[in-house]
């Protein structure tokens, strides 16, 4: 075949709107390669659709043979005739194929579908199924060249799209509807059993042709099993029996899912929830295994794109799923599927949302952060996530955006401002720098900067030279004493209580959020040239003497605390420090105020007028049990 004339179109894409094509949105294909995506540079662009990848797919034509193929380059996947195209692989396009750029089974209004029409006479003749004695063209889901002569009042794809079109009746015109030709048995090469047909044709036959008891069922097709994936790339392979047909016919006829099933369906895997987790604050729910893969590449909710703060188990929904499966045991996942999901589950307890590094997207809000919403598991996709690695793992590659290792070079010490980098020191930099993580070693995520570090907490119990990695009170992990936290604005998220840097604003509202009483304390310290650090050291000394009390008897000046636990205990000590200031050392305007009935427990003391009128550095006297 001679080279194609660029001015003469070799194909056409018509937008599908329900059962009709939109003639106003027909696109003629001239170029050798036609790209589809969200980028504005694509030939067919969807700039406002977040479900479309930047470069979603591309349609190419072989100028010599005239063959047209589609290559998927997306994250969410491209669907042709409701069969998933494996990423980075090509799929031959034939006259009448329906291309789903966006396919949502439970949200058909969001579907973006196009009908491909070949305008190349050579390609039509190449796929002409004139031979009805078992020709290869009939087995590979081809259409008649008579399509060129038909009107497009009601175009039909080459495979069954019963959820999109509403005309299941047979047609006397071959080429408009492949199902009609197949029902007569001629295009299947004389085979009377659908189980002897190729998987591509098997997928194209509607439910009404598979079983006489299932006529009239127009529900969406059941989810294909994964063994179908390699059939789409080997169209000449015809198995002795089709397991898909056997699987579908052994179950109840396809029906629309009931409201309860829709409510209990995970939008990522499109199956009933398994080990359900909820995201906070939006409270959307997903399978724990599904969201485990998602959270490694995006910190946004898959449903509403709201930033996720916490991940929690949803026990109520888990109980509802169990009750639903008791009534519908046929919808239960297989044992192999459940074991696979349990192995991929990384959410074993309530946890904070880990921080995700987004460095490979060239557009804000790129859908490359979206999870693979398909039937293809992670082992068959090239976007599977590696094991968690930190800067001490062997083979770790430091990105240009990676912060410098702790401790930083000495020439930068003088240029730091308070809060721009860790402000406290550690006694274990040498041992930390020499450590190398074992292969696939355990890691823990810092609560402050959300960066991974080696989990050596158990090792520290036997080796005091290993730096502390968690708070003594809340047991949350922090990396500051291990190798220095690099989060901007961190004052030192983990340190001994006496070395904690609480910041200059730690005295604001320090006394039960009572700004008036807090200002009295600040003025008292300023008049004597004292700082909050001096007050903390005096209070810790009073704790040692037994004068001041803390709620946890383990806390002293050397106890390793995080910033939040340290600030909370600092406020407790500050109240006792203010309570022990002699009245003679305070202004008369302060000591002349009567005590509030509610004392330190007063909920009105945050109001300036009430705080100025009454003293709240006292105990409650009214209604005290």
UniProtKB/Swiss-Prot annotation:
Q: Where is the composition biased (Low complexity)?
A: 158-171
Zn-finger region bounds: RING-type: 266-305
| Regions of compositional bias (Polar residues) in chain numbering | 140-149, 206-216, 411-427
Residue span, FHA domain: 34-85
Supply the alphabetized keyword list.
Answer: Cell cycle, Cell division, Metal-binding, Mitosis, Nucleus, Transferase, Ubl conjugation pathway, Zinc, Zinc-finger
Stretches for region Disordered: 123-171, 205-229, 350-386, 401-427
Reaction(s) the record says it catalyses? S-ubiquitinyl-[E2 ubiquitin-conjugating enzyme]-L-cysteine + [acceptor protein]-L-lysine = [E2 ubiquitin-conjugating enzyme]-L-cysteine + N(6)-ubiquitinyl-[acceptor protein]-L-lysine
Entry annotated with the keyword Metal-binding: yes
Record-level Gene Ontology MF annotations: nucleotide binding; ubiquitin-protein transferase activity; zinc ion binding
User: What is its subcellular localisation?
Assistant: Nucleus, PML body
Query: What EC identifiers does the entry list?
Result: 2.3.2.27
- Please name the pathway: Protein modification; protein ubiquitination
Q: Residue spans with biased composition (Acidic residues)?
A: 362-380
By its UniProt entry, which Pfam families does this protein fall under?
FHA, zf-CRD, zf-RING_2
Family note: Belongs to the CHFR family.
Identification of the protein by name: E3 ubiquitin-protein ligase CHFR
Organism lineage string = Eukaryota, Metazoa, Chordata, Craniata, Vertebrata
Name the gene that codes for it.
chfr
């Amino acid at each position: 075949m001679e080279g194609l004339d660029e001015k003469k179109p070799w194909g056409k894409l018509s937008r599908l709107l329900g059962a009709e094509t939109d003639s106003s949105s027909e696109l003629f294909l001239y170029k050798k390669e036609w790209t589809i995506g969200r980028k504005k540079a694509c030939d067919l662009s969807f700039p406002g659709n977040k479900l479309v990848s930047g470069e979603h797919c591309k349609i190419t034509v072989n100028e010599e043979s005239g063959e047209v193929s589609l290559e998927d380059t997306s994250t969410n996947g491209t669907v042709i005739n409701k069969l998933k195209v494996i990423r980075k692989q090509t799929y031959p396009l034939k006259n009448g194929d329906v291309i789903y750029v966006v396919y949502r089974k439970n949200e058909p209004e969001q579907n973006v579908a196009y009908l491909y029409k070949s305008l190349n006479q050579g390609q039509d003749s190449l796929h002409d199924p004139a031979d009805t004695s078992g020709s290869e063209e009939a087995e590979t889901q081809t259409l008649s060249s008579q399509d060129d002569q038909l009107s497009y009042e009601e175009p039909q794809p080459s495979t069954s799209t019963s959820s999109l079109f509403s005309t299941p009746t047979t047609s006397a015109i071959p080429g408009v509807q492949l199902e009609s030709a197949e029902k007569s048995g001629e295009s299947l090469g004389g085979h009377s059993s659908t189980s002897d047909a190729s998987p591509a044709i098997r997928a194209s036959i509607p439910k009404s042709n598979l079983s006489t008891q299932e006529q009239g069922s127009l529900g969406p097709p059941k989810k294909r099993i994964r063994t179908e994936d390699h059939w789409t790339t080997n169209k000449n392979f015809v198995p002795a029996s089709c397991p898909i047909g056997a699987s579908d016919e052994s179950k109840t006829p396809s029906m629309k899912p009931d409201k309860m099933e829709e409510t209990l369906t995970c939008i990522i895997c499109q199956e009933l929830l398994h080990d359900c987790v909820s995201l906070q604050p939006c409270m959307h729910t997903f399978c724990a295994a599904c969201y485990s893969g998602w959270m490694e590449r995006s910190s946004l909710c898959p449903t509403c794109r709201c930033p996720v703060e916490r991940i929690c188990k949803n026990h109520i929904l888990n109980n509802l799923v169990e009750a639903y499966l008791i009534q519908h045991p046929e919808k239960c996942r297989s044992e192999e599927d459940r074991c696979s999901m349990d192995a991929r589950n990384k959410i074993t307890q309530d946890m904070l949302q880990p921080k995700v590094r987004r460095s490979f997207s060239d557009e804000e809000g790129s859908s490359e952060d979206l999870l693979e919403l398909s039937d293809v598991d992670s082992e068959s996709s090239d976007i599977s996530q590696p094991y968690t690695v930190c800067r001490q793992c062997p083979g770790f590659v430091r990105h240009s955006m990676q912060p410098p290792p702790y401790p930083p070079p000495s020439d930068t010490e003088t240029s730091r401002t308070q809060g721009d980098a860790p402000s406290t020191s550690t006694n274990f930099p040498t041992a930390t720098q020499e450590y190398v993580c074992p292969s696939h070693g355990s890691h823990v995520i810092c609560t402050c900067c959300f960066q991974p570090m080696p989990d050596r907490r158990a090792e520290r119990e036997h080796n005091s030279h290993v730096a502390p990695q968690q708070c003594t009170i809340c047991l949350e992990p922090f990396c500051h004493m291990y190798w220095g936290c690099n989060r901007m604005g961190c004052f030192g998220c983990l340190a001994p209580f006496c070395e904690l840097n609480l910041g200059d604003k730690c005295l604001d509202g320090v006394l039960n959020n009572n700004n008036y009483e807090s200002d009295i304390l600040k003025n008292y310290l300023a008049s004597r040239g004292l700082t909050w650090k001096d007050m903390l050291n005096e209070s810790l000394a009073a704790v040692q003497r037994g004068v001041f009390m803390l709620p946890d008897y383990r806390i002293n000046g050397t106890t390793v605390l995080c910033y939040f636990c340290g600030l909370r205990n600092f406020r407790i000590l500050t109240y006792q420090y203010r309570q022990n200031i002699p009245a003679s050392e305070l202004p008369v305007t302060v000591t002349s105020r009567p005590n509030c009935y509610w004392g330190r427990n007063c909920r009105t003391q945050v109001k300036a007028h009430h705080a100025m009128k009454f003293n709240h550095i006292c105990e409650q006297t009214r209604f005290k049990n």
